[in-house]
Design a protein with these regions (language model features):
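Second RecA-like catalytic domain
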Residues: 1-220, 247, 251, 274-310
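Accessory interdomain/linker segments of ATP-dependent helicases and helicase-like nucleic-acid enzymes
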Residues: 94-111, 322-335, 339-341
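Long, contiguous regulatory modules within eukaryotic nuclear regulatory proteins
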Residues: 132-141, 341-360
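Short amphipathic alpha-helical segments with coiled-coil-like heptad repeat character
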Residues: 161-164, 260-267, 371-373
Length: 375
């Protein structure tokens, strides 16, 4: 009811709450079940038994008639209720509970909503007090078609007497869970899983999986999974990892974007130091190849340390980094450009390109041989 006040659905929720406080007013005698079901069908809703209560309440109040219509006597009215298999005594109980709730609302000076509430407003209000009675339909064999996985691992079935025109949806909420031959859900209504995020945000348990670098977005992204009482509300939702663990996101950003250069071509062009550094690294790698040594170029950890020392601590994605670099490079054009000395190990300092230039090969002068005739 408190939630309904905030969501402007107080009028409807008072009717539903009072209906759930008494025994169902619809009679279903053993010897007249088919006739009762036929009479009750006009109250049924496609998606929600809660909505069915509202239809039934309106019919009960309109059936007697009033201004502008022929008003039935009490006897005629009670006869009409019996013909439609509506229990008179329970209707009175329902009205009594409704009146009591209405009085409490009036004492608090809460106003009933003037405009009819939407399906979402009504069911969000109801859901706030029934989060432990949600269910998710499993898929599989024929039995699973009526079976729902509930909170904390329980399994239940929709009640066979549910007043719905259509089969319940994938996600439902129940007014109550009743165990007879097996566990059944009564008072069923279809809900949307995103409503659970809104109403049950304080109960969601979230887990981040697979933090990874996304080249197109130029940021570190993780996949979020949220559960409510063990039920997976959503999974695989992309979340910016910098909002969760900025330090880890920054490290991954530097390694992937700056050290490895894993950026889209257009962003790569806007960061000229990358091309300059890659060109210089290629030259040092060429020296390694010519010298047949593997200890000329420093390892990636030292290149990472170079960037880590100069990049601001709060920068952990492509957008924020590019904005910072554009401003900082105006004052320091050589910002983030590596030098040859920074890329070569100290023990390889003596190696340079001139050491591998080819020296000219001397050609011996021709010798003259004298013949015997000349002699």
């Amino acid at each position: 009811i408190l939630e309904a006040r905030a969501r402007e659905s107080l009028d409807e929720v008072l009717v539903i709450a009072s209906a759930l406080s008494v025994q169902d007013v619809r009679d279903r005698p053993m010897d007249m079940q088919a006739q009762a079901d036929q009479a009750h069908a006009k109250f049924d809703d496609d998606r929600s038994e809660f909505s069915g209560y509202l239809t039934l309440w309106k019919w009960i109040n309109d059936a007697k008639g009033g201004e502008g219509t022929h008003k039935l006597s009490n006897r005629q009215y009670e006869q009409l209720l019996r013909q439609n298999f509506v229990n008179i005594r329970r209707v009175r109980e329902w009205r009594d509970i409704y009146s009591q709730l209405h009085t409490v609302v009036a004492e608090h000076k809460w106003r009933l909503n003037a405009a009819p509430a939407s399906y979402e407003q009504i069911h969000l209000s109801m859901l706030s007090g029934l989060l432990g009675n949600i269910g998710w339909k499993t898929e599989g064999d024929e039995v699973a078609q009526t079976e729902y996985l509930g909170a904390r691992g329980i399994k239940f079935h929709r009640h066979p007497g549910a007043h719905l025109r259509k089969k319940p949806g994938r996600w439902i909420v129940c007014a109550e869970l009743v165990e007879t031959t097996r566990l059944f859900g009564r008072g069923i209504a279809n809900i949307e899983p995103q409503w659970l995020e809104e109403v049950g945000a304080h109960l969601l348990r979230k887990q981040l999986l697979d933090p990874h670098w996304e080249k197109k977005a130029a940021e570190v992204v993780a996949l979020e999974r949220a559960t409510l009482y063990g039920l997976v509300v959503y999974s695989g939702r992309r979340v910016g990892f910098d909002k969760v663990d900025p330090q880890a996101a920054r490290e991954m950003f530097i390694r992937q974007a700056l050290v490895a250069g894993d950026l889209l071509p257009e962003m790569h062009k806007r960061l000229p130091f990358l091309a300059a550094n890659e060109k210089l690294i290629a030259k040092v790698e060429s020296l390694e190849h010519k010298s047949r040594r593997q200890d000329v170029l420093v390892d990636e950890e030292l290149i990472y340390a170079f960037y880590d020392q100069q990049v601001q601590p709060e920068l952990c994605n492509g957008r924020s980094f590019e904005n910072w670099y554009r401003a900082a490079a105006q004052a320091r054009p050589e910002l983030l450009k590596l030098t040859r000395d920074e890329l070569m190990r100290p023990e390889a300092a003596g190696i340079h390109t001139s050491a591998f230039q080819l020296s000219p090969i001397p050609i011996p002068a021709p010798t003259t041989t004298l013949s015997h005739q000349s002699a």
